[in-house]
């Protein structure tokens, strides 16, 4: 029987994906810690919306619906830098597949 996913599971996977791949997909380089937290929260929302776990806001809906114009028009300044990462999450990440790695991912070497 497959484990029922939780909000925490989605956040764990979004966080791991950001620290594995996010920096290479962010326009304009480095984000501050508040922006990183925002990216992880919105990334988790993209994954939850994609899976039907919960419905995200208008930016997230546009990303999930592959609506580039809508996503750009609804993106805040941080999300404009992160559109590539958000579309990567939408197209290539399965929470149930990535969850075990996310639970065991070593963040201390990355976060400094």
Task: Give residue spans per PLM region.
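Short, functional C-terminal segments
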Residues: 1-25, 99-112
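Detector for methionine-enriched segments
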Residues: 1, 16-17, 25, 48, ...
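Charge-rich, solvent-exposed alpha-helical interaction surfaces
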Residues: 9-20, 38-42, 67, 71, ...
């Amino acid at each position: 029987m497959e484990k029922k996913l939780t909000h925490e599971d989605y956040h764990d996977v979004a966080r791991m994906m950001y620290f594995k791949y996010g920096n290479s997909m962010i326009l304009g380089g480095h984000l501050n810690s508040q922006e990183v937290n925002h990216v992880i929260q919105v990334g988790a929302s993209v994954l939850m919306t994609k899976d039907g776990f919960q419905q995200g806001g208008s930016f997230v809906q546009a990303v999930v619906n592959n609506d580039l114009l809508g996503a750009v028009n609804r993106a805040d300044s941080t999300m404009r830098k992160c559109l590539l990462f958000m579309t990567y999450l939408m197209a290539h990440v399965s929470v149930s597949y990535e969850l075990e790695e996310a639970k065991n991912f070593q963040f201390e070497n990355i976060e400094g």
